[in-house]
Amino acid sequence: MHRTNRISPYVAAAACVFLAGAGTLSLARSQPAPSATASTSLSYEFFRDKVEAVFLHKREGHTRCVACHTVNNVMTMHLVPLSPGATTWNEEQSRQNFQWVSRVVVPGYEDSLLIKHPLDEKAGGDLRHGGGQQFASKDDPDWQTLRAWVMGAK
């Protein structure tokens, strides 16, 4: 009798999660290390008033950033889940989002993951964003908002 060696679905799922995490971590390591004061050089007010709205905006053919980046997973960028019935974050949640998102930003660095990762490859982005290329070009107003924050807008 010949026994077929089959991989368990659980092992396959664990391998996929591991490989997805490894790819994301290598992306995070590919940008320069932020200085100790990186989060203080980014404007919390601009983030709260303009950047968080980008994460909530529904774009044609895509899901909202908040849909994937609030689940407990191995993604580099994480957002606080919205409170039940809420359409935006409260002050405490926004401060936590600011801290978490600041980790994927090097202030003033044009290739920070936050602005490169969701940008279409033809426009200078990369292919590894599991949520697809959210921004077709650098002319997209939401992409320009993210870039403005990364580049130091107040």
Regions found by a protein language model. Give the residues of each.
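Bacterial N-terminal signal peptides
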Residues: 12-22
